[in-house]
Regions:
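Eukaryotic N-terminal low-complexity, Ser/Thr- and Lys/Arg-rich leader segments
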Residues: 1-2, 7, 29, 99-101, ...
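N-terminal helical cap/lid subdomain that shapes the substrate entry/recognition surface
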Residues: 2-96, 103-104, 117
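Substrate-recognition "cap/lid" segment bordering the active-site pocket of phosphatases
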Residues: 86-87, 115-177, 183, 187-192, ...
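Short acidic-hydrophobic, aromatic-tinged amphipathic segments that line or gate anion-handling sites
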Residues: 216-220
Length: 230
């Protein structure tokens, strides 16, 4: 049985595609109403798992200066909190899977490009508060964390917390399971030398993910339960 489960958020535990695309659209309508980014480009950026800075840089370049970056990200987050959160839904089977992990006392972590506050709000709004400890939710502004596939979120953030607060002195990466939907998630798992479950139902580029040969492939969160017990 695994000793730690690390979940991606967008496209893995939660269906957030509409919330992200609509909030990007609202951000442009607010800050640059003369320009509407093509939905196809937004979809590709979501599929790649790009963070907010990279997303707006791709949609705005060369106008995207460091000053503009802060303004656009702050506006996006404000709009996401008031509009985007209402469009987020947990994928079927999320609660059952987290309940199963909790019943076996398997620590659950979330490593996401989202802000921690947005992740916590989504969990609360969807009846999943308390399933994932707050100190195991890693977001884009978590000290020491770096965007996947960089292993820093695991090596420099999760491991110290697990040792200090959960008594996990020795963490065998071979018993860690990363669950995610994009190339970044699969590569992150490879970089920390864990096993990886690719969620084919998510937003990632299917051909690119398949080429990386993930250890497990699922079409629903319900299928992850069997992997956890193996």
């Amino acid at each position: 049985m695994i000793s730690l489960a690390i979940f991606d958020f967008d496209g893995t535990l939660f269906d957030t595609h509409e919330s992200i695309s609509q909030t990007i659209k609202l951000t442009f309508e607010t800050l640059l109403p003369s320009h509407t980014p093509p939905q196809s480009k937004i979809h590709c950026l979501i599929a790649s798992g790009a963070g907010l800075a990279d997303t707006f840089k791709a949609l705005l370049s060369p106008e995207f200066t460091p000053t503009a970056e802060n303004e656009w990200i702050e506006k996006y987050r404000a709009l996401y909190a008031t509009h985007g959160q209402l469009l987020i839904k947990a994928f079927p089977g999320a609660k059952d899977l987290l309940t199963e992990l909790n019943s076996h006392k398997i620590p659950i972590a979330i490593v996401s490009n989202k802000g921690v506050a947005a992740v916590k709000t989504a969990l609360e709004r969807n009846g999943l508060e308390g399933y994932v400890p707050e100190d195991l939710i890693i977001g884009d502004k978590t000290p020491g964390a770096k965007r996947k596939p960089d292993p820093a979120s695991f090596v420099d953030v999760l491991i110290p917390v697990l040792r200090e607060k959960y008594g996990m002195d020795e963490i065998d990466s071979g018993r860690v399971l990363v669950v995610g939907d994009t190339v970044a998630d699969v590569q992150f798992a490879r970089n920390i030398k864990s096993r990886v479950c690719w969620c084919r139902y998510g937003y990632g580029d299917q051909r690119a993910c398949e080429e990386l040969k993930p250890d497990f492939v699922v079409d629903s969160l319900g299928e992850v339960v069997g992997i956890v017990k193996a």
